[in-house]
């Protein structure tokens, strides 16, 4: 595989240290996609501080003009706005629902975390008898207006409140739909809400969409990023903050992982079925093994991504956040190692990947990863473990 030359493509804007790779623009803590013609826009510190992700290319998965993202109110810079503009995610749900009319026809649907109500509207178009959308955020005022403007007020009822506190005017529902996934599948997810609603309201032969999820990992080489990151903290406007290096390494990095960085096989570490999963099952420990496929390379850490499936439907679908596929709102998650290790084709890393949720809302995850690196044809081994925390 031909490797791109990253070293000749480095630029510095304002207080962020960027490097460019494969058309992507990175900083130590933010990721931006940009067109070279818009350099002035992205070199403006106010824009850089405000924007969380800009992606201009339909080919990569997002649409929308970033110039309209500021001054439109916090609602439209929120998770809801970004999700609506993730055409990979939205088109997947659209196709799942509208290509399974037989499942939705005359059924009662529960949309958990309905946001703007887009999934509820899809369900109505697919022939659902009635849809109840539950949302705890203040956006429900706008959601009801959207439903009204689309002449669906008789089909869709929006209920404001937490899933554990609201009551439905029906005893059971036939289908639960939700965009329940978070970064790394679990962080910030609504999976506990799905479990609660499933146990309380779902009919015995009902459907959960999506109903299946997996997390996979692979090794990466990304020494440039790590080196630039370390240099940044050594001199922050003349202040030595190098003591923060270990803390930064201990926080999972949510961002774009260009597929060229991947240098090993992949391994699945979690496989869940939404029809049977329990909250206690989401604290897990899984063994893994990956094998490197390039010589004279380095091991900088693990990249994780997730896949979800709609497996019980007549027309089945899946959605992936795999680095080899189009980018989604959820990006990928990278767990950097403290040090880079030299690896060659055939070398292996084995270990365990443990995840614990100390809260009940998945707004914090504690992770422990053990690493055992074995060099093929040599008696050299290195073993250690690291702790990471989503918060």
Tell me the role of every PLM-derived stretch.
Residues 2-6, 15-112, 116-354, 358-391:
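Class I SAM-binding transferase module
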């Amino acid at each position: 595989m031909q490797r791109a030359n990253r070293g000749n493509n480095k630029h510095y804007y304002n207080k962020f240290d960027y490097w460019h790779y494969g058309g992507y623009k990175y900083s130590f803590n933010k990721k931006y996609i940009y067109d070279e013609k818009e350099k002035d826009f992205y070199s403006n510190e106010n824009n850089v501080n405000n924007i969380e992700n800009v992606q201009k290319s339909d080919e990569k998965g997002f649409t929308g003009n970033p110039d309209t993202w500021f001054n439109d109110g916090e609602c439209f810079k929120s998770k809801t706005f970004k999700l609506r503009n993730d055409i990979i995610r939205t088109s997947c749900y659209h196709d799942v629902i509208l290509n399974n009319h037989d499942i939705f026809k005359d059924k009662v649907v529960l949309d958990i975390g309905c946001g703007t109500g887009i999934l509820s509207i899809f369900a109505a178009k697919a022939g659902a008898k009635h849809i109840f959308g539950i949302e705890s955020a203040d956006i429900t005022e706008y959601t009801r207006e959207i439903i009204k403007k689309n002449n669906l007020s008789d089909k869709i009822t929006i209920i404001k409140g937490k899933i554990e506190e609201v009551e439905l005017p029906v005893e059971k529902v036939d289908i639960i739909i939700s965009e329940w996934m978070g970064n790394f599948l679990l962080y910030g997810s609504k999976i506990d809400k799905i479990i609660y609603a499933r146990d309380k309201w779902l009919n015995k032969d009902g459907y959960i969409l999506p109903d299946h999820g997996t997390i996979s990992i692979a090794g990466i080489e990304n020494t440039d990023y790590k080196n630039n990151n370390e240099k940044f903290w050594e001199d922050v406007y003349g202040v030595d903050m190098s003591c923060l290096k270990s803390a930064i390494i201990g926080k999972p990095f949510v961002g774009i992982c260009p597929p060229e960085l991947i240098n090993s096989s992949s391994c699945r570490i979690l496989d869940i079925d939404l029809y049977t999963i329990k909250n206690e099952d989401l604290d897990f420990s899984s063994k893994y093994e990956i094998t490197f496929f390039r010589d004279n390379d380095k091991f900088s850490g693990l990249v994780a991504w997730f896949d979800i499936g709609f497996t019980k439907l007549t027309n089945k679908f899946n959605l992936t956040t795999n680095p080899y596929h189009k980018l989604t709102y959820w990006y990928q998650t990278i767990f950097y190692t403290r040090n880079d290790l030299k690896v060659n084709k055939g070398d292996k890393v084995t270990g365990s990947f443990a995840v614990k949720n100390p809260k009940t809302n998945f707004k914090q995850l504690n992770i422990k990863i053990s690493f055992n690196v074995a060099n093929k044809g040599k008696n050299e081994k290195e073993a250690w473990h690291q702790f990471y925390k989503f918060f």
